[in-house]
Amino acid sequence: MKKVLAGIVILLLNGCAMDPDLAPSDIEKATTTVDAVEGSTEQDSGLIDMLRRREDPQAGDPAWNPIRPQAKPEHYATATGSLFSSIQAQDLYDDTKPRGIGDIVTVMLEEKTQAKKSASSDLDKSTDLSMDPLVLGGKPLTIGDRDLSYEVANANKFSGTTSADQSNSIKGSISVEVIDVLANGNLMIRGEKWLTLNTGDEYIRVSGTIRPDDISQENTIESTRITNARIQYSGTGNRQDVQEQGWLANFFNVSL
């Protein structure tokens, strides 16, 4: 009896493992452990990448693939049996703003930030102690050939200053796709642009959440209206590497 029960349990477990509903979807298979903007967070085992402590993003990353809406057959019926679909329907006097997955919107990059910080600290401390020679009977009191007097002086001074001034600006445009529609109607967007130059590649990546009401009639939206925005403009290759300190220079520049 125990053998029969054990066999039934094994068959049930095998059936669950073969259930197509539990199998990973095509989207999960194509998804990599890639950050939304900065690229792969997995370190390469190569010596160069280990010393650089970073890995360049790559064009054609599956995590940044274009979103392709599912194609509908030429003749189809909705769940209600009607040919009319309220999701795809558009009013006669309605605008053509993006509202669905795969729609395109142009982001106008207008970012400018500036930060300044300065601090200073001064510490000054001094101590002076002295005692005149003791006089006893009109004569200085001595021990041997030394009189009983002392003089002590101590001074301690510290001064430290620090300042930081950082500013950046970016101006341009990039077209991105709607990758998800939230329950409140907000749109999640994502997109990238790669430029191949003579000495390397440059890329722009943008992701975040926008409101359809903020999209203009020209199908554009300002980057300052993107919430949870992640904007990256950088490059790859040797030209980018020379702008960063090497691992040995960083080692000697550590503050002790």
UniProtKB/Swiss-Prot annotation:
Residues 1-15 form the signal peptide. Assembles around the rod to form the L-ring and probably protects the motor/basal body from shearing forces during rotation. A lipid is attached at C16 (S-diacylglycerol cysteine). GO terms for cellular component: bacterial-type flagellum basal body, distal rod, L ring; cell outer membrane. It comes from the Bacteria. The keyword Protein transport does not apply. It is a lipid-anchor. A lipid is attached at C16 (N-palmitoyl cysteine). Belongs to the FlgH family. This is Flagellar L-ring protein. Keywords: Bacterial flagellum, Cell outer membrane, Lipoprotein, Membrane, Palmitate, Signal. GO terms for biological process: bacterial-type flagellum-dependent cell motility. InterPro entries: Flag_Lring. The basal body constitutes a major portion of the flagellar organelle and consists of four rings (L,P,S, and M) mounted on a central rod. GO terms for molecular function: cytoskeletal motor activity. It is found in: Cell outer membrane; Bacterial flagellum basal body.
